[in-house]
Amino acid sequence: FYDEDKWPSGFAGGLIPGLGEDFRAKCLARLDLQTAIPEGGRLLKKDSLYQYIQYTAQYGYDIFNGACYADLFNPNAVRKFIESTHQPYFEKYSHKVADNALFIFTDEPHIHARYFDARTKHHGLLSYSPYLEEKFQELYGYSLRDHLGQLYEEKGNWREVRWHYYLAKALLFEESYTRQIADFCDQYGAQLTGHYLGEDDLKKVRDRIGNSALHYRSMQQPGIDHLGLSIAHRLFTPKYMTSVADQYDKPRRLSELFGISGQNVNFQERKWVAGWHAILGVNHFCPHLTAYSLKGARKRDYPPTFSYHQPYWTYNKRMEDYLGRISYAATVGHFDPQALVVSPLESEYVKGDREGEFTSGMVQILEALQNNHIDFNLGDEEVILEKAAVADSQFVIGAMRYRYVILPDMLTIRQSTLSLLLRFHKNGGVLYSMGRLPQYIDAKSDPAALNELKQAVISLRIAEFKAAPEKYIPPGVRITGPHADEVWVQRRKIKEASFYLLYNTSDIAPLSVTLQLPAGSQNPVLWDPAKPGVFQLPVDKNGGVDITLAPAGFYWVTTGKLSEGIPAKPLPQPPGLKPLMTIDAPWQGKRNAPNTLVLDFAEYSTDGGRTYSAPEPVIGIWSRLNDAQYNGDLRLRFSATIRQVPGHCALAMEQPGAFRQISINHTPVRFSGDRYYIDPSIKTRDISGLLREGRNEIELQIPFTACDPLNSDPVKRYETELETIYLTGDFGVFSDQVQTIENTQRNLSEDLVKRPAYAFESFFINREKDRFDGNATLSGYPFYAGGMALSNSFEFPSPDSGKRYFLDLSACEATVIEVIVNDQRADTLCWAPYVVDITKYLKKGTNRLQLNLVNSLRNLLGPHHHKGAELIKVGPDSFTGAGGFPDGRGEPDWYDLRKKKTDLAIWTDTYYQVPFGLLGKAVILSD
């Protein structure tokens, strides 16, 4: 269950802040003495230059349904949140499911100081609450209010005050929110999961949630968020979470993943992102998101949607089965890391304004360990305080034992941590420093103790470690090869067996490596969850096994009792394939869904049709009318150019019943029945007999009511929704102006396969082509969402019985490719390698090849007008020119600026579409 009306969690759709000011989010603000205290502000203290106020959030946030956020430092507010949300769910459903099968997902709760009066100038906002004052006093025995200035200025014992402040903040948020909800879940055999806001780096963690490790330790199933189509330099978040899960022996770990990757994220890319998670210890995948409906703004709600709307939905089970297999593999046995990296989070607490951040140096260490096949955990100092001990020469945290401890760049260290590290060193443990040693203990100067630490550590530059890692920390398993650092491994501990997870971090290239097995390893077996298949691994004289990993390939190797009785097949040796012939265009194309022309520009009138605007984006018209709070008659006039009238054509649109009149070329039409396109909210009506060659006009009349985004009534929050309309049917969609674009947002990434996008300026309807070169996007189907059967024939000499023949479809762009040779299904390709063995299907003479291709909703739903062309991070504002997350800067009045031909940051009237079909030739290979 999801615990909120929207996000961030905790305000119960507005119910909690509605209980009174004590329940509303608060912050500390520093103002000039002459600045008027805004409504909601309460003076806490003054000094000679500033006044410090506690500000209580006021109603007026659209994200909170016109209300504001809740004070999650307040345990009473959280208790009311539980009573309004968790308790009704659990009382209704807990008896219907088995223990530990009921989950509640919390989404981005936080204590970030971000809700303040926009008109009041300030000198910094910090998290605050009367409950935080009380917690601070309880923990440290002095008043936080007396030291507010030291949260802003570097005077006196400011480092210690800040350390205490952030510790109190982190501990109280865990206690008030996470632990209280987790304890309530325990009563019902339920599990708290989800993720918190700002887990990406240490500064965000400090400011937004205090300490993510504390929430991970309290959740029954800790979780994280992974947004966008990238994995580079993002180790910190999953490793922090899985480290705490390891230490507290929490076997399942969740990630909300694939969010904002866009409708065109394919199975290969999902495999790439998921494999990265699994090799780092995540074993429960929560895809973002499934849309109940695509009505209105839902089409733009941080796509993709994983739902029946997607053309590939029939095949999605293959992806989910694969995810299930690698999730299970990541739970077998126990993680057995050699090294612990102490988290420098608390150095982020105590740093001054001119002192650098601590995330990047730490991440360099994590990447160096991961790339050199050294298993590790992160150690949070609060977790160390609660769970750590020294046993012989091992540093123990809960369920985990480490033989090496690494200190990254640090400014302060706890006395409790230092004492354990010195004992660890005294007992023979190895202690490295790969950055500046701490200058403070518990945020206070203690030169003698720090000198003792200096004597104990082996100082080591990261470059030295990278040059000869085995000299300092022997890897858990040795992997060699030209690109061995791009193959990540995780060793799982099992009695009388070996178990290794392997992952190719490259989404682009296959990689070949040699895995060195321990002496005496018996019966090594390779498990490939993508085929799926199990294969015998030949061992060389040195105990090595050679493995070739497909792009984003995830595998595991077992030996000993884990391989006993497994019906493994001989490992197929990659043949040395050479091109034999190509299958040339033209191809015949047959779609399995209606073709579509998207109409997202219209002329509009607010004077009863006497005058009309020039064509504008429908989403821009909606924005302008709402910004002006226009209420009244609205007329929209869409146009479509037709060069040959199609035999069948339908108008598809949302909420036709809300319109006073709908007309096609001045002929009124009515919608009836339940026929729809893509989603039940998009109704269809046959208009075949109403079209003509040339310009066709579709006119809509509706009583427009501006939305009130601050209204608690959901109807009034949205009111009249203006959306794109569609023509669907049996026709082709063409353009006289098309350009190939290589400089896309996607192609700026070094980690993704490069592919072009196409820029269209306008469209017209004409007869479909009988044959084309194989790229459907450029051949009459730029907006098409569905399946396309490409057919061709080729002559082949008598096949050689001693040879194998393969069809290489690397030049094909589709989410799914089903290969049919001479009316027999050879394979269905969902991910690399896009090569299929067709040996047994070939015959002498004429052979028929059919490629059943399936795409996504990207070309239908967009975003079509973003200058990035093909995006790897997509949000609602990616469909407009307004800017915001994840697009960055834009222009709030973009819809007016575009009329002035202003060069906008994001928006362009050009349509950007992605390829669907063959971008090159299909090639037959032979060994």
Provide a role label for each language-model segment.
Residues 1-79, 83, 94-95:
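Acidic/aromatic-lined carbohydrate-recognition and catalytic surfaces
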Residues 554, 649-651, 688-706, 805, ...:
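Short, well-structured beta-strand segments enriched in hydrophobic/aromatic residues
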Residues 563-580, 703-738, 855-924:
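Glycine/proline-rich low-complexity spacer/linker segments in large multi-domain proteins
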